[in-house]
Curated annotation (Swiss-Prot):
This is Lysophospholipid transporter LplT. It is found in: Cell inner membrane. Catalyzes the facilitated diffusion of 2-acyl-glycero-3-phosphoethanolamine (2-acyl-GPE) into the cell. The keyword Cell membrane applies. It comes from the Bacteria.
Amino acid sequence: MRESAHTNTSLWSKGMMAVTSAQFLSAFGDNALLFATLALLKAEFYPDWSQPILQMVFVGAYILFAPFVGQVADSFPKGRVMMFANSLKLLGAASICFGFNPFIGYTLVGIGAAAYSPAKYGILGELTTGDKLVKANGLMESSTIAAILLGSVAGGVLADWHVLAALGICAVVYAGAVVANLFIPTLPVARPGQSWRFTPMTSSFFNACRVLWRDGETRFSLIGTSMFWGAGVTLRFLLVLWVPTALGITDNATPTYLNAMVAVGIVVGAGAAAKLVTLETVRRCMPAGILIGVGVLFFSLQHALLPAYGLLILIGILGGFFIVPLNALLQERGKHTVGAGNAIAVQNLGENTAMLLMLGLYSLAVKAGLPVVGIGVGFGALFALAITGLWIWQRRR
């Protein structure tokens, strides 16, 4: 089924609702499956060091397939690419459920996620236009964060009840995402006729990297989003060590609740950005980025639970307000230069590389015996300074 003129600019069109529903189910499955698979590793007495390997193979798939997934998203109707990617996730979850090696199964999920990302964001620019693209990004980010919240909690609760049942429910959720993809209109291919030989494909990707990096606005967006997501993943791990040190609470639930506060804040911030920021006023988001670092600094010095909750909600609001306009800017500029799919693939490479780099630096700091509170203060200060530098550079440009 094709929509006339290829786009329906309404945020509540059938196509947008199908994309948002598929994204919610897919992200819900990703987060529920992570905690269900971690429970499986514990139940089968895998060593503790094996648990972070799950996240590593997931992120590694993004980096390994970065040169290819953007072209896939731009060479086929994006709704069908999303359906194929969710089918890979379904296969990975089902294989874990039926007793196959969980790392191999989770790698399949990671490959599916890598293929899914350029298509899910790239299709927004084909279903909406102009300033509605910012609002569409806000809707997508809000749906994603809600899925992260609910999926994480559901994965843990279901795994405590029955690990295999939790894995099976994850597979059913992915199946629901596949069905939702069927309702996305078949849109025209963005960049038909590209070569599928290895060398031209990699050359095309790295050419897209060069084109986006040489453009001041897209370089600005790439750096900003990469720093944000690298910092977000690092903060998640920082909380695990910070809670017992700063609050004297040793349970496993409290860090999860604190992470949830950040996610709630991001939903609010994403909604505010959709209403207050346009593609012409993207720089309005930069003070929020600086204040994220300041918020982390003050949060690290807290010794009571209530102000910690409040500061993390505030950090989340600032984060949502910061990331949504930068995503929209990259999609809009990328669509007219290298294709939206290639632009998002380049963005994924930057973000996941930043995640690995920041987590590596954090791990080195912990291994060196630096106090967790000091790490948090330094991390917040460095992030604020980095975003300030990015803002100054952009203003001078």
